[in-house]
């Protein structure tokens, strides 16, 4: 009977080039397949147009649920409207979308609060600092972390933002971006990165310039 058919669950994350999303997908797969259901995973590789197309393909695969981590929290909306029209519920993880009415629920950390904690830690360990930001401007989670950090430092003039660059949350992008800033003479006391891969990239660039031991990341 139709009731006995396995559920088909589609997932698409902003990139599988981040171990964080690989772990999430592996844990989902363990639970879903243990119930006899089917997980269909897609990787847009940080391309929102590609992610929108993947979602359309998943709809053609007759999925019953979409688990989503959007590449761009605004540009995902056309695909979400198609999913809503198809009557498929959406669970957003580790980020948000610009129109929450298009999803069933959102599961995310307090990213703004995480940024606040990073700023507080920096102020507790340093009397002053010139800071570089390594960002990911198209993701709400990344934006919120940086915003929480900046808002917390705003009333402390001894902590100044002297440069910023977008890494798309990727090690291989963060490294040359940090290198570019250093070559421009922008030498920070601290670097605030939105995630672990971008921090590793920034650290690699600082290491090449002999600055890692002098810089808080």
Regions found by a protein language model. Give the residues of each.
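Immediate post-signal peptide segment of exported/extracytoplasmic ligand-binding proteins
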Residues: 1-9, 33, 126-127, 189
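Periplasmic-binding protein-like
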Residues: 10-11, 63-70, 89-93, 132-133, ...
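Hinge/beta->alpha junction and helix N-cap segments in small-molecule ligand-binding domains
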Residues: 12-26, 41-50, 72, 106-117, ...
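A short, Lys/Arg-enriched amphipathic alpha-helix followed by its capping loop at the start of a domain
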Residues: 24-37
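Short helix-capping segments at alpha-helix termini
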Residues: 33-35, 83-88, 152-160, 184-187, ...
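Short, well-structured alpha-helical segments in soluble
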Residues: 49-63, 172-187
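Flexible loop/hinge segments that line or gate small-molecule binding clefts
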Residues: 65, 69-113, 124, 139
């Amino acid at each position: 009977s139709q009731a006995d058919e396995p559920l088909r669950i589609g997932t698409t994350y902003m990139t599988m080039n981040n171990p964080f999303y690989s772990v999430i997908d592996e844990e989902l797969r363990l639970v879903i397949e243990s119930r006899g259901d089917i997980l269909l995973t897609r990787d847009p590789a940080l391309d929102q147009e590609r992610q929108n197309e993947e979602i359309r393909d998943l709809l053609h695969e007759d999925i019953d649920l979409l688990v989503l981590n959007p590449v761009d929290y605004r540009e995902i909306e056309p695909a979400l409207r198609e999913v809503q029209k198809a009557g498929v519920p959406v669970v957003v993880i580790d980020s948000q979308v610009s129109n929450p009415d298009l999803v069933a629920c959102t599961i995310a950390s307090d990213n703004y609060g995480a940024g606040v904690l990073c700023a507080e830690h920096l102020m507790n360990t340093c009397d002053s600092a010139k800071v570089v930001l390594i960002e990911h401007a198209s993701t709400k989670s990344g934006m919120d972390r940086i915003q929480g950090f900046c808002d917390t430092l705003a009333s402390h003039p001894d902590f100044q933002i002297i440069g910023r660059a977008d890494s798309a949350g990727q090690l291989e992008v963060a490294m040359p971006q940090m290198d570019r800033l250093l070559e421009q003479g922008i030498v920070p006391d601290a670097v605030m990165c939105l995630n672990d891969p971008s921090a590793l990239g920034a650290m690699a660039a600082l290491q090449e310039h002999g600055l890692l031991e002098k810089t808080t990341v």
